[in-house]
Regions:
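N-terminal secretory signal peptides that target proteins for export/translocation
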Residues: 1-19
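Aromatic (phenylalanine/tyrosine) cluster motif
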Residues: 14, 25-27
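Hydrophobic h-region of N-terminal signal peptides that target proteins for export
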Residues: 27-35
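Acidic, metal/ion-coordinating pockets
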Residues: 35-289
Length: 289
């Protein structure tokens, strides 16, 4: 059993350019129990990559020449050599934004994510842009789980392809990971998400997090595509979630921000902007009885 005697969270943002910038932020969550064994894991996060296969190409843009899958893949390869206990997640909207997506409808993005060894992703609203059948095609190609707990997909072709959550048994720990998607109304054309039933993310999160806790998860991670404002509400009205990795609002945070959950406990929320320019890093230190 693992107790969160303390969780030390560090966010390193690596900018996609030669001579990467490193910004370090540290905070502690108060002790809950006496530890006998310490375990450290690193969580890496991307979100709202929007098909940015190549670096930014618009001259005059402050991010010109940054981002791109090659830079990210190179960084990940080197990072894993130096840090063996790493989990890699994406918070949705891998789709839409360049001709690669228009031509290949997401296949390039998913295959590259397979090569980079992603551990899980959740669904962004732009994943629906070519409809449910295309989503099913892509998720079958994925060598990583796709999780979304607040979309009822039983009446769609995604029924057996998307899970509410997964439990990853890594590094001697059980890591519970669940996803949350944005409300389709106003974001997704009705004919592109027919049969998808949106459910309240707060109610669903409390249910799933409690279930993951009962299943003995040492860490519970939420992959959210709700946007920063909804993530703030999510924290304030839930319990048992240890980390929220967010997307959708294209918010770049220079470090994780702590919010109090319904029990008054700190929960770090992390957003890493858009276009794959940044990779977020969160270091967790857990103490096991």
């Amino acid at each position: 059993m693992t107790t969160h005697n303390h969780i030390t969270s560090v966010l390193n943002i690596f900018k996609g350019r030669t001579g990467k910038r490193l910004m370090l932020f540290l905070f502690l969550i108060p002790a809950l129990a006496i530890a006998q064994e310490t375990k450290k894991i690193i969580i890496l996060q991307t979100s709202d990559v929007h098909s940015r296969i190549e670096p930014m190409t618009q001259e005059g843009d402050r991010n010109y020449g940054q981002g791109g899958f090659v830079r990210r893949a190179t960084f990940l390869q080197q990072f894993r050599k130096e840090n063996p206990d790493v989990l890699l997640f994406d918070c949705g909207d891998i789709s839409q934004g360049t001709p690669y997506y228009n031509m290949f409808k997401g296949e390039v993005e998913v295959n590259l994510m397979n090569e980079m060894g992603y551990d899980a992703m959740t669904i962004g609203n732009h994943e629906f842009d070519f409809g449910l059948d295309n989503m099913a095609r892509l998720f079958k190609l994925a060598k990583f789980p796709v999780v979304c707990a607040n979309y009822d997909l039983d009446a769609t072709v995604l029924k057996d392809l998307v899970k509410p959550y997964v439990i990853l048994e890594r590094f001697g720990l059980k890591v519970g990971v669940f996803g949350l998607g944005a409300k389709p109304e106003g974001l997704i054309q009705a004919n592109k998400c027919e049969g998808v039933i949106y459910q309240d993310p707060i109610a669903v999160s409390n249910e799933i997090a409690e279930q993951l806790k009962e299943e003995g998860c040492d860490v519970i991670v939420c992959l959210s595509h709700l946007g920063i404002q909804m993530d703030e509400k999510l924290v304030a009205n839930t319990r048992n979630i240890d980390v929220i990795l967010g997307g959708h609002s294209h918010t770049f945070m220079e470090g994780p921000k702590n919010y109090l959950n319904i029990d008054g406990k700190n929960v770090p929320v992390m957003h890493t902007g858009k276009n794959g320019i940044y990779v977020g890093r969160l270091d967790l230190t857990l103490n096991k009885k």
